[in-house]
Design a protein with these regions (language model features):
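N-terminal juxtadomain amphipathic helix
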Residues: 1-76, 236
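General small-molecule cofactor/ligand-binding pocket signal
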Residues: 14, 141, 233, 355, ...
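Conserved catalytic loop of SAM-dependent methyltransferase domains
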Residues: 18-24, 207, 236-254
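Acceptor-substrate binding/catalytic loop of class I
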Residues: 32, 37, 204-219
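Fe-S ferredoxin-like electron-transfer domains
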Residues: 43-116, 121
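Conserved SAM-binding loop
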Residues: 86-203, 215-233, 247-249, 321, ...
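Hydrophobic, well-ordered beta-alpha structural blocks that scaffold small-molecule cofactor pockets
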Residues: 87-88, 246-261, 265-405
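Short, hinge-like loop/turn segments at secondary-structure boundaries
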Residues: 138-142, 207-210, 252, 329-330, ...
Length: 405
C-alpha cells in the first residue's frame, strides 16, 4: 500500500479511477531513436482518506525537479504574471524586496519580474536551462529544494514564487519546509497549481497526466500549506484552471504529527481530529472520456470519408492525453506546436509527429483541432490570420468539441 504524499496516510486499495493507454510523460518526448520503445501506461487515481488529496499512486516522472515550460512566453501568460506581480508588490508593499522563483526554468516568468522594482533571482535544477537564463542576463543558480535543510544561495529571501511546480513533487511538504527555512521572518510567497475543481467542473479528464502526481483543491492546498508553516492570505482562480494563493510564513516550530497509518508524514496533512474529507466524484471524468472518444473519432471518420485531413494544435499534456486515450495514432496528420524543443519529436503513446506551425504550408490540413485550454482564442487567431479561411477550426472545450469556424 502506497502512502499519501502529503500526510503519510495509507492510500486505499481501490482507486477512484484507472486510466489506461496514458502518456508516460509530457516532457521526455520521444525522438526518432526512442519512439519505437515508447508505449502507454496505466495510472491509478486515488484520494487520501485522511487529508483528501487526490493523487496518482505511482512514482513521479524522473525529471520532476526540472521546470520545462512551453507556454511561458505566450501573451496570455506574460500578461497574467505581470498582473499577479503588480498586485502582490503593490498590495503587500514589497518594493525593494528580495524575490526568488523556485523552479524558474529558463526564466520565462523571472524576466517579467525584472520589470518591477524588486531584486529578482531564481533557482532551477536543469543545468542547460540555468545556462540559458544566465545568457539572457537573469540571476539564476542551479539547485533544488531537495531536503528541509537545503540552503538557497544568496538567501534568506523576502518573497518566493512557485508557478505550477508543486503538483510535480512527490514530497511537497519537504519542498515547502525548505522554502520556509530560506525565507526571512514574515516572508511571503505566490504559488500556483492546476485546479482539481476545474478538472471536475468541466470533466476534463485530458488534464490528467503522469507528470502531475497531485491534484489540489483550494482546501487540500491550504491544508498542506498550513501544516508546513504558511498561512494563506489570498486565494484566486486564474485563467479558469489554476489555483493561485498568496501566503505568509508563520513563526514557531512546526509540529510533526503521526499519520493514521502510524508513519511520520512527509509534510503534514489534515489536522488531528478533523473530519474525514468527502469522497471526490470522478464519474463525470469517466463519462467525458467515453463521450470525447466518440466525438473525436466521429470527426476523424467524417473527414476521412470526405478525403480530408485533420491536425491537432497543442503538444501539451492535454493534447498528448487526448491523442493517446482516443488512439489517434495514424489517424491524424500531425500535432502543431510553437515550442522548438518539441518539434521533430513524437507525441508519447500516440506517436503523432510534432511539427512547427510553418509545416502547415508544406502539408496543409483541412481541419485543425485546438487542444490547449487557456490559449484557444490566441491559437484560433493565428490560424485565421496565417492559414486562410478554408481551414475548419475546432477546439476542445471542457467535455466536448466546439466548431469555431
Amino acid at each position: 500500500m502506497r502512502a499519501c504524499i502529503a500526510c503519510g496516510c495509507g492510500l486505499p486499495e481501490q482507486p477512484l479511477m484507472t486510466l489506461d493507454h496514458m502518456p508516460a510523460s509530457a516532457q521526455n518526448i520521444p525522438d526518432g531513436e526512442t519512439v519505437a520503445a515508447d508505449e502507454g501506461i496505466t495510472l491509478n487515481l486515488c484520494q487520501c482518506p485522511s487529508c483528501g488529496l487526490v493523487q496518482f499512486d505511482c512514482e513521479p516522472v524522473d525529471y520532476y525537479r526540472d521546470v520545462i515550460r512551453a507556454g511561458g512566453f505566450s501573451t496570455t501568460m506574460v500578461e497574467l504574471r505581470r498582473r499577479q506581480y503588480r498586485h502582490l508588490i503593490e498590495t503587500w508593499h514589497l518594493e525593494g524586496k528580495k524575490f526568488v522563483e523556485v523552479g524558474c526554468g529558463r526564466g520565462e516568468f523571472l524576466s517579467v519580474l525584472t520589470e518591477f522594482p524588486v531584486s529578482a533571482s531564481g533557482i532551477e535544477h536543469k543545468e542547460d536551462l540555468v545556462k540559458i537564463a544566465r545568457e539572457n542576463g537573469l540571476q539564476v543558480t542551479r539547485g533544488f529544494a531537495e531536503t528541509e535543510e537545503t540552503v538557497f544561495p544568496d538567501g534568506p529571501y523576502d518573497v518566493f514564487l512557485s508557478f505550477n511546480f508543486l503538483e510535480h513533487q512527490p514530497e511537497p511538504g519537504v519542498m515547502l519546509r525548505c522554502i520556509r527555512r530560506n525565507l526571512r521572518e514574515g516572508g511571503m510567497g505566490l504559488i500556483t497549481v492546476p485546479s482539481l475543481e476545474y478538472i471536475l467542473q468541466y470533466d476534463g479528464y485530458y488534464e490528467l497526466i503522469h507528470d502531475h502526481i497531485a491534484y489540489y483543491t483550494f482546501e487540500t492546498l491550504e491544508n498542506l500549506l498550513t501544516a508546513n508553516g504558511f498561512e494563506v492570505l489570498e486565494r484566486e482562480m486564474v485563467n479558469r484552471d489554476t489555483l493561485s494563493v498568496i501566503v505568509r510564513r508563520t513563526e514557531g516550530e512546526l509540529a510533526e504529527e503521526k499519520s493514521p497509518a502510524g508513519e511520520l508524514p512527509a509534510g503534514g496533512g489534515a489536522a488531528p481530529g478533523s473530519r474525514r474529507p468527502a469522497p471526490v466524484d470522478v464519474s463525470g471524468l469517466a463519462a467525458s472520456r467515453r463521450y470525447i472518444d466518440e466525438e473525436v473519432n466521429g470527426l476523424v471518420d467524417r473527414l476521412h470519408s470526405q478525403g480530408k485531413t485533420l491536425a491537432i494544435w497543442g503538444a501539451s499534456h492535454q493534447g498528448f492525453t487526448l491523442a493517446a486515450t482516443t488512439r489517434l495514432g495514424g489517424k491524424v496528420s500531425y500535432i502543431i506546436d510553437s515550442a522548438p524543443f518539441k518539434q521533430g519529436r513524437f507525441a508519447p503513446a500516440s506517436h503523432l509527429p510534432i511539427v512547427a506551425p510553418e509545416h502547415f504550408f508544406q502539408e496543409p490540413a483541412d481541419a485543425i483541432l485546438i487542444v490547449a485550454p487557456g490559449y484557444t482564442e490566441e491559437i484560433a487567431s493565428i490560424i485565421r490570420e496565417r492559414f486562410g479561411k478554408q481551414v475548419e477550426i475546432l477546439a476542445l472545450k471542457s467535455n466536448h468539441m466546439e466548431t469555431l469556424r
